[in-house]
C-alpha cells in the first residue's frame, strides 16, 4: 500500500556545529526501515516521468518498487544496468532539478527521495560481505582508449567493457576518479569508501587504468592510434583550467583558484596530519562565486579552521546556481553570504599578502539570455571586506593540451572540444563528452555523455569491421 505522507523521510545528518570542524560525511544515509518507508511513497507511475529526467535513464520506479519490497539486491541490479556509479550519483546528483523535478508526488508535497534511495541501495550493496564476484565480460578483440578518469570516462569505460571492448583509461593524476577525487570534498563524497570502490569495480570488470599519463605530453592521440593500435579514442578529460576575475590584486599571496585549493585538500589530503601537503589555514576567507564549487570551497575553509567565511555573489539568493541542499548546508555551518556584491579589486599589504577584497554593491536588472536577472552596479557603493584569503570559484574550462597537440580537432569559442549529439568530433574515430565538451557541468550530465559516447563508439567500430 502506498505511503501518502506528503514529506520525504529526512536525511540523518551530522550536527552542523560538530561537522563544520571535521571532514566526515555530512549525510549519514537512510536505514533499511527509512528506505522502505520512503520507497512506499512512490506511485509507480506507468509513464515514468521521473526516468525522463535522468541523463542515464535509470529505471527509477522499478528499483524503488524493489526497495519497497525489501529486495535491495534486485534494486541494485536494476540501477547498475544503466548506471555504473550509483553510490556517487546518490550523493552528488542534483536530483531536485532532474528526476525528482518530474515526480508526480512533488505536485502536492515533496517528491520521492529518489537520490536518497539510490544511495541507500548502493551503500547496502557495498557493505555486503557476500557480494557476487564480478566476472569480466569476454573480449571482442577491439581496443578503445579513454582519456581522463572522471565520471564521463568511467561511465564510457564501463559501458564499453560490458559490450566486450578492451578498454584502457589514461589518467594524468596519480589516482583515478577525476573531479570525483580532486573536486568534491570528502564530507560530500568519501574517496576510499565510495569513489575507490566504484573505480575498483571497473577494474574487476577488466578496465585497465594507467595513471600519471598526460595525453598530449607523454603521448598524443595520433600515437594512441598508430603505435598502440586503438580503434577509437574517447576524450573525457574534463574542465580543470580555472577561470579568474582579471581584477587588480589577483596575484597577491593568499589568492587561490578553487581548483587549486580543493585539489590540495581533496586529492593531496592537506587536511590530514599524516600528509605533508602545504596549505594555508586562513582565519577570514572570502569565496567568490555562487555555484556548488563555491559552497565546497567555503565549507572546506571552515573545516581548516577559519573563524569567518564569506561567499560573495553578484546576484541574489534565488539566482544562486548551487544546489539548494548545498546552500542550506553552508548556511547551517555558519558560512555568511554577501549577496548582490561583485569583487572589483583585491587589496594587500607591503609584503604582498591579502588584506581584503573590494566589493561593489549590485542591483538586479532585466533578465539575461538564460532568464536570470542581470546584476547592475550601484555607483559609489564600493566597500572593503577584510580577509586574509580569497578563493575564486567562478568556473573552469577545458585544458588546451589535447586540442593543441591533435591536428584536425575542432574546438568551440570557449575552448571545449567540438562534438555532435553522438559525441563524434571532427577527427574520425575520436569521440568526446562531458566537461571537455560542455565546460564545467554536473556529474550526471557527464555520465550521460559517457553513455552516448560508448554507444557511438560501438556503432563506429562495428561499421568499420563490416
Whereabouts are the PLM-identified features?
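Feature captures the FAD/FMN-dependent oxidoreductase FAD-binding
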Residues: 74, 138, 143-147, 199-247, ...
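Beta1-alpha1 glycine-rich phosphate/pyrophosphate-binding loop at the start
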Residues: 3-28, 57-69, 78-80, 107-115, ...
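FAD-site-proximal beta/loop scaffold in flavoenzymes
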Residues: 251-282, 367-440
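Ferredoxin-type iron-sulfur electron-transfer modules in oxidoreductases and energy-metabolism complexes
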Residues: 19-37, 59-91, 108-138, 265-266, ...
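A conserved FAD-binding loop/helix module that cradles the flavin
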Residues: 436-464
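Helix-enriched interaction subdomains in cytosolic or periplasmic regions
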Residues: 93-124, 239, 243-251
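Local cysteine-cluster metal-coordination motifs and their immediate loop/turn environment
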Residues: 40-62, 84-107
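Glycine-rich dinucleotide-binding loop and its adjacent helix/turn
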Residues: 121-138, 195, 200-217, 242-304, ...
Amino acid at each position: 500500500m502506498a505511503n501518502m505522507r506528503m514529506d520525504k523521510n529526512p536525511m540523518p545528518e551530522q550536527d552542523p556545529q560538530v561537522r563544520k570542524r571535521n571532514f566526515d560525511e555530512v549525510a549519514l544515509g537512510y536505514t533499511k526501515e527509512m528506505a522502505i518507508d520512503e520507497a512506499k511513497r512512490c506511485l509507480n507511475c506507468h509513464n515514468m516521468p521521473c526516468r525522463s529526467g535522468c541523463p542515464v535513464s535509470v529505471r527509477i520506479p522499478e528499483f524503488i518498487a524493489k526497495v519497497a519490497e525489501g529486495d535491495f539486491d534486485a534494486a541494485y541490479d536494476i540501477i547498475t544496468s544503466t548506471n555504473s556509479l550509483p553510490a556517487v550519483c546518490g550523493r552528488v546528483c542534483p536530483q531536485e532539478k532532474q528526476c525528482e523535478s518530474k515526480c508526480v508526488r512533488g505536485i502536492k508535497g515533496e517528491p520521492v527521495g529518489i537520490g536518497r534511495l539510490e544511495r541507500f541501495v548502493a551503500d547496502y550493496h557495498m557493505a555486503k560481505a557476500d557480494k557476487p564476484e564480478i566476472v569480466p565480460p569476454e573480449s571482442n578483440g577491439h581496443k578503445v582508449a579513454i582519456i581522463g578518469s572522471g565520471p564521463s570516462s568511467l561511465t564510457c569505460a564501463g559501458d564499453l567493457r560490458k559490450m566486450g571492448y578492451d578498454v584502457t583509461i589514461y589518467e594524468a593524476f596519480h589516482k583515478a576518479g577525476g573531479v570525483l577525487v580532486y573536486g568534491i570534498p570528502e564530507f560530500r563524497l568519501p574517496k576510499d569508501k565510495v569513489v575507490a570502490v566504484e573505480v575498483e569495480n571497473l577494474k574487476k570488470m577488466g578496465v585497465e587504468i594507467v595513471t600519471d599519463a598526460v595525453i598530449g605530453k607523454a603521448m598524443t592521440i595520433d600515437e594512441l592510434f598508430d603505435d598502440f593500435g586503438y580503434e577509437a579514442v574517447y576524450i573525457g578529460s574534463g574542465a580543470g583550467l580555472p577561470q579568474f576575475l582579471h581584477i587588480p590584486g589577483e596575484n597577491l599571496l593568499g589568492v587561490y583558484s578553487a581548483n587549486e585549493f580543493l585539489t590540495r585538500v581533496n586529492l593531496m589530503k592537506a587536511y590530514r596530519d599524516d600528509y605533508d601537503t602545504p596549505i594555508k589555514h586562513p582565519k577570514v576567507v572570502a569565496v567568490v562565486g555562487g555555484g556548488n564549487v563555491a559552497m565546497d570551497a567555503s565549507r572546506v575553509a571552515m573545516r581548516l579552521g577559519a573563524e569567518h567565511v564569506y561567499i560573495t555573489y553578484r546576484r541574489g539568493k534565488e539566482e544562486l546556481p548551487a544546489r539548494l541542499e548545498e546552500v542550506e548546508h553552508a548556511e547551517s555551518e555558519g558560512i555568511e553570504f554577501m549577496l548582490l556584491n561583485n569583487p572589483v579589486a583585491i587589496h594587500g599589504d607591503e609584503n604582498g599578502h591579502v588584506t581584503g577584497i573590494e566589493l561593489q554593491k549590485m542591483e538586479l536588472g532585466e533578465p539575461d539570455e538564460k532568464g536570470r536577472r542581470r546584476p547592475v552596479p550601484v555607483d559609489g557603493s564600493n566597500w572593503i571586506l577584510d580577509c586574509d584569503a580569497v578563493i575564486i570559484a567562478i568556473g573552469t574550462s577545458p585544458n588546451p593540451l589535447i586540442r593543441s597537440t591533435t591536428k584536425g580537432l575542432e574546438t568551440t569559442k570557449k575552448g571545449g572540444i567540438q562534438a555532435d549529439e553522438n559525441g563524434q568530433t571532427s577527427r574520425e574515430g575520436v569521440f568526446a563528452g562531458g566537461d571537455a565538451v560542455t565546460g564545467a557541468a554536473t556529474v550526471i550530465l557527464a555520465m550521460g555523455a559517457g553513455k552516448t559516447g560508448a554507444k557511438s563508439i560501438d556503432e563506429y567500430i562495428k561499421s568499420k569491421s563490416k
